[in-house]
Design a protein with these regions (language model features):
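Exported/periplasmic ABC-transporter solute-binding proteins
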Residues: 1-132, 141, 145, 151, ...
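Short Pro/Gly-enriched coil loops immediately N-terminal to beta-strands
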Residues: 16-21, 175-197, 208
């Protein structure tokens, strides 16, 4: 129950491409214009580029992609992540940890962390290559801000517009074996949840855009993340343009 609204069922799932939720990994540029929380420039930020490269390269091996794609099915009977069509596959060497590179700081989203995917994958990476991955999670906006503050070596997030801004502002770099700064490789779907009574008739909506329009036109309550996260960014893109949200 949220704000007097009983949310007890998923009423729209995987309806169309607008519900796609794509995950992207980006390496942090050690020469980026780092700032503090007040926007002041920060110098002498140490970024573990070698460790970030190793983790990103490992994420994109066929073996790891297969592990991610199959994660969740045995426990939940459903796949929680899918490999994105056209995702690059890394086939080169992956450098093991050294004393200087063994700690990797990963800033990611709550959806990735809470899914349990990293808890499943990272111990395999750590035991194989000798690294220790320190994971901090928040909404995408805050996860990206952590990198801008110099507190991450790489980010794993899911909001294209914010990712592109991160790249354009000079915070990203390419990784050996890849052509682009943004490496999108996994996806799943957002779902629309609400009361089983479904007063807005969302279940009958032809698309998620129609569903949001019905909610807006009927002035039904809607619970928003409202936090600049990837989920919030997606939500804002789905409301009718006429509302000016």
């Amino acid at each position: 129950t949220q704000a007097g609204l009983v949310v007890d069922t998923c009423i729209l799932k995987e309806a169309d491409d607008k519900m796609l939720n794509t995950y992207t990994v980006i390496a942090v540029n050690p020469e980026a214009p780092f700032v503090d929380a007040d926007g002041n420039s920060v110098a002498d930020v140490a970024v573990n580029t070698a460790g970030a490269d190793a983790l990103i390269q490992w994420f994109l091996t066929q073996e790891t992609l297969d592990l991610a794609a199959n994660y969740g099915f045995q426990e939940y009977g459903e796949y929680l992540f899918y490999v994105k069509d056209g995702a690059p596959v890394y086939t080169g060497e992956i450098a093991p940890a050294t004393e200087e590179t063994k700690v990797i700081r990963l800033s990611t989203t709550t959806s990735v962390k809470d899914s349990g995917l990293l808890g499943y994958l990272l111990p395999i990476f750590e035991s194989t290559y000798g690294y220790t991955v320190e994971v901090q999670s928040a909404g995408t906006g805050k996860a990206i801000s952590a990198a801008k503050f110099g507190n991450a070596d790489l980010i794993l997030v899911h909001a294209k517009s914010q990712e592109e801004a991160f790249v354009e502002e000079g915070f990203a770099r390419t990784v050996d074996g890849f052509e682009a700064e943004r490496i999108s490789f996994l996806y799943n779907y957002f779902v629309l949840c609400g009361p089983s009574a479904d007063p807005a008739g969302v279940k009958e909506a032809a698309s998620v855009l129609d569903a949001f329009a019905a909610i807006a036109e009927g002035e039904y309550p809607f619970i928003s993340r409202g936090d600049g996260s990837g989920t919030h960014t997606k939500e804002l893109s789905l409301w009718p343009e006429a509302l000016g949200i």
